Regions:
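Conserved beta-strand -> loop -> alpha-helix junction used to position metal-binding or nucleic-acid-contacting
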Residues: 110-124
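Acidic, divalent-metal-coordinating active-site segment for phosphoryl/phosphodiester hydrolysis
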Residues: 148-161
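Conserved non-catalytic scaffold segment of RNase H-like nuclease domains
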Residues: 1-114, 129-144
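Acidic two-metal-ion nuclease catalytic site recognized across multiple nuclease folds
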Residues: 159-241
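Short, structured loop/turn "capping" segments at alpha-beta junctions
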Residues: 112-113, 143-146, 166-172
Length: 241
């Protein structure tokens, strides 16, 4: 199986109005147990890098102006890698990078290939979702150059390899549901935050994506009641609002 590890650095979190400024891609063969090809590219865009994004990523506008690839070239590279793969993998890729890629492709007048999406934030068996650097550290793995797109892409693959890629891919195929928290509202909402629930301002709820098979275990582990949201409320709408 060929898997494409993928990560973006962007000008912000808005998939409609922000842009990819760095692309990290790495092809991995499960049969050979090694990376086959990798690329990291800065990407030019019509949205300027802010000081805040520079503080987070280390990427400066001057570097993009001098060394960045045009968007058309960068997205061609993305397609080249994804087209060789059966699946894409990344950390929080299901909520962020892949939807960002879909919006980017649509804006460029193309459609992304259909592949499986494996998310090391959600799909690692028996491990609580956390930041990539934290999950790697708990596995005894070093993430050098965090917030470098290529380092993060390869880091997600290394994390999956540590936990068993076959097990991670299998878990990625278990349906994911949206669970709502019914914790009493407090000034700091600590219970919700500690249990990894996220606030959705459009629906005005605290929610979390959970594997269908993990709902009962989550209900036992938190000090408040939860419920599975009706399927009319899509995960995509929750993630994108």
């Amino acid at each position: 199986m060929i898997i494409c590890a993928l990560d973006f650095e962007t000008t912000g979190l808005d998939k409609n109005n922000d842009r990819v400024i760095e692309l990290g891609l790495s092809l991995y063969s499960t049969g050979h147990g090694r990376f086959l090809d990798s690329v990291g590219q800065l990407v030019k865009s019509d949205v300027k890098v802010t000081p805040k994004i520079t503080r987070i990523t280390g990427i400066r506008q001057e570097a993009i102006d001098a060394y960045g690839y045009e968007e058309s070239s960068a997205i061609s590279t993305l397609f080249e890698f994804v087209n060789q793969s059966s699946a894409v993998i990344g950390h929080n890729i299901r909520s962020f990078d892949w939807p960002f890629a879909e919006k980017w492709a649509k804006r460029m007048g193309v459609i992304l290939p259909t592949v499986e999406v494996v998310d090391t934030f959600e799909d690692i068996p028996g491990v609580e979702p956390q930041k990539l650097v934290t999950m790697m550290a708990e596995a005894g793995l070093l993430l050098a150059d965090a917030h470098s797109a290529l380092a993060d892409a390869q880091g997600s693959l290394r994390l999956a390899r540590y936990h068993g890629i076959d097990a991670v891919v299998s878990r990625s195929r278990i349906p994911t549901v949206a669970v709502q928290s019914h914790a009493p509202r407090t000034s700091d909402n600590r219970d919700n935050k500690e249990a990894k629930f996220r606030w959705n301002p459009a629906c005005k709820i605290w929610w979390r994506a959970v594997k269908e098979t993990d709902v009962e275990e989550l209900a036992r582990s938190v000090p408040f009641s939860i419920s599975v949201l009706d399927k009319s409320v899509s995960l995509e709408s929750l993630r994108n609002s």
